[in-house]
Regions:
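Extracellular and select intracellular beta-sandwich modules with Ser/Thr-enriched
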Residues: 643-647
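Glycoside hydrolase catalytic-domain context in secreted enzymes
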Residues: 1-617, 626-641, 653-662
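Short beta-alpha junctions and helix-cap segments that line functional grooves
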Residues: 620-622
């Protein structure tokens, strides 16, 4: 093997396809450029050789980033984190994750974008472009169908091919347009085969189908059989020489050298894997690394993204806050919560308490904080708040749910019991209660939603959380975030959560009906629909036009009018419905969106091009994407349940053009 001027004997090729230590590629004693990996995706999570975690900017979690529906901000987040990768010697950031939020119980939902494959894919694509524009590699993960943390090392996602293609592989296919340097294969099995040993997924689809030409890296410890993984398409097993105890009964099978000698490992496969690792080192060596932002600017970037990612879910006219005095309850108002695991970031920015930010807002708003449910809190804190509230203009409760993080799933989607109890007690005494929810995924608010005046979904919004929230509450920022996932009325309404199946087998019985595709198709009531979010401004939609462009494309245009006195941003969403489908299809599917700034009392014409694949489904008999002739409905709305405009079109294609190139 020869890569440029690098000649490698068989022994060095074998060393190359497993990592060096916990985080590095084997540089073969200096023969190759060293490559260092570090975790993300909400900021650099890097542990040095002494076990110390580097300090970094805590960016909003991907759920908050997705709630912005802003592609420019997705790119900005990637650029911002790349700066700190450069400053700390990280060459490849292990992010982003584009796994679908199949169930609200997944403990890592806060690390993923959406329940929708299109939104997940395009946000992931822009994030990758941001990271790599600075000369740092991105790692697209966790490929694929890794949608629970429950027994993640051994669970098998049992999913039919059409569902796999349309829902779980589609976000990867879209994000791969950004050409990430690496893709990470996941821990789980798909239909009984470990992803790390699945040639159909890693080679036939990822490389031959999607055209990925970079390096396939295993998740840390996901390789059970080194030679089988190399044969399937894994290039680099991380970390160094990890083999599970259960497999050690026949260790020589896992020894790549022995497998090569026995003919179990083909020389061509080893050549491919080692070559892809060498090419990764060459990318690192050739990278033009550029730091864009100062430390202060990175913080401002975090705040800017958080402002657009906060979602106003309910408002009975109490927001924005008027001048007055407000009691603030909850530890999140002082120190916001965040998820754990690989996405943990050790921040060095000291967040300001919400009441201090109120005081400095210039809006004559005063706040006083009460801990309520922190470690040192007691019923005494509640009594103090209740007494103080008699002379206050309102109560702001900052609540959060049960622990979220890597390697475990949520036990509930409700907020913690004592917090719910205090909401119930305080709303019995006072009318003006506002609830701010700091959570990483869907929350069941049904027991108390009708008792409060306003609800703000803050999410895990990073080190700028309270600055962003204050700006929204006092009206300096007009909220523009919308939900990137459906909030069901209760956990029982979430079809995909009904049991873990039989042992380690997870049946995807719902098929393609994930998230709003399920709720909208089967007319299920929801607490808040996909794409929903309120604003202080008001928008009207009008004048939908759909014009054919080329043989299979369509231009969709419509007008958005801001009828309020406030300049604001609106997220409009374009859905497609196959009216008389020959196969089972959802009620509607998101195919495009636009986030537009519209000045008060002005209009904006939005134009979106829909390519042919927007109308396609995956045909099992044809083994291809197929566009069905017939009637389709173009829908434009403010959410999946708030469709403002509709227009029917008829597609009539000759047989030779009916197969999409997707």
């Amino acid at each position: 093997m020869e890569m440029k001027n690098v000649k490698l004997p068989k022994e060095e090729k074998i060393r190359l396809v497993t990592g060096k230590g916990e985080w590095n590629v084997n540089d073969l004693g200096g023969k190759l450029t060293s490559v260092r990996f570090s975790d993300g995706p909400h900021g650099l999570n890097m542990i040095d050789e002494n076990g110390n975690r580097k300090k970094a900017t805590i960016m909003p979690s991907l759920v908050v980033l997705a709630n912005t529906w802003n592609l420019q901000l997705a790119r900005l987040q990637g650029e911002t984190i790349a700066d700190e990768c450069i400053e700390n010697g990280t060459d490849v950031l292990l992010a982003p994750g584009v796994n679908i939020k199949r169930t609200p119980l997944n403990g890592r939902n806060f690390e993923y974008f959406s329940e929708d494959p299109y939104l997940s894919g395009v946000m992931g694509r822009e994030y990758i472009l941001g990271v790599q524009s600075s000369g740092v590699g991105a790692c697209l993960k966790h490929y694929c169908a890794n949608n629970l943390e429950f027994e993640r090392y051994y669970q098998s996602s049992e999913v039919d091919e059409r569902t796999l293609r349309e829902i779980y592989l589609k976000p990867f296919e879209i994000a791969l347009e950004a050409q990430p340097w690496t893709v990470m294969c996941s821990y789980n099995l798909v239909n009984g085969v470990y992803v790390s040993e699945n040639k159909w997924l890693l080679t036939d689809i990822l490389r031959d189908g999607f055209g990925f030409s970079g390096t396939v890296v295993s998740d840390w410890g996901a390789v059970h059989s080194p030679y089988r993984s190399v044969m399937a398409g894994v290039d680099l097993a991380m970390p160094e020489a990890v083999v599970y105890e259960a497999e050690k009964k026949d260790y020589e099978i896992h020894d790549l050298n022995a497998a090569l000698e026995k003919g179990l490992l083909g020389e061509e496969a080893l050549e491919r894997a080692a070559g892809n690792v060498v090419r990764l080192t060459e990318k690192v060596a050739a990278a033009d690394k550029q730091v864009r932002f100062s430390k202060e600017q990175r913080h401002e970037n975090a705040v800017s993204i958080a402002k657009e990612g906060i979602v106003l879910l309910k408002n009975d006219g109490i927001l924005p806050l008027k001048a007055g005095k407000y009691c603030i309850g909850g530890t999140c108002a002082v120190k916001p919560v965040a998820g754990n695991g690989s996405a943990y970031v050790a921040g060095d920015y000291v967040q300001r308490p919400l009441h201090e930010l109120f005081r400095e807002s210039g809006k004559a708003i005063e706040g006083k904080s009460f801990e309520l449910w922190g470690k040192s809190s007691s019923s005494h804190d509640y009594k103090l708040l209740a007494e103080e509230a008699y002379s206050a203009d309102g109560i702001i409760l900052c609540v959060h749910g049960y622990k979220e993080g890597e390697s475990f799933d949520r036990s509930s989607i409700a907020i913690r019991h004592r917090q719910e109890e205090y909401i119930m007690r305080l709303t019995e005494l006072y009318d003006n209660v506002i609830v701010c929810v700091y959570e990483g995924s869907a929350v069941d608010m049904s027991p108390w939603i009708d008792r409060v005046r306003a609800v703000v979904f803050v999410g895990y919004a990073g080190e700028g959380t309270n600055e962003a929230l204050c700006s929204v509450l006092v009206g300096d920022t007009v909220p523009s975030g919308k939900l990137s996932e459906t909030f069901p009325c209760s956990l029982a309404d979430a079809e995909a959560t009904l049991g873990h199946g039989n042992g380690f087998v997870i049946p995807y019985r719902e098929g393609q009906f994930v998230g709003y595709r399920y709720y909208d198709t089967f007319r299920k009531d929801v607490l808040f629909p996909f794409g929903f979010g309120l604003s202080y401004a008001k928008f009207e939609y009008s004048d939908l036009a759909v014009v054919k462009r080329g043989e299979t494309g369509y231009e969709v245009s419509y007008t958005i009018e801001n009828t309020s006195d406030l300049d604001a941003k609106e997220i409009s969403q374009v859905y497609i419905r196959d009216v008389f489908a020959m196969v089972e299809r959802p009620e509607q599917e998101l195919k495009a969106f636009s986030k537009d700034f519209v000045k008060a009392h002005e209009k904006k014409r939005v134009r979106i091009l829909l390519a042919a694949d927007a109308f396609a489904y995956y045909s099992i008999p044809l083994k291809k994407w197929y566009i069905e002739n017939g009637d389709f409905e173009i829908r434009v709305g403010a959410s999946s349940r708030d469709i403002r405009l509709k227009q029917s079109i008829r597609i009539e294609l000759p047989n030779e053009t009916q197969v999409s190139q997707s």
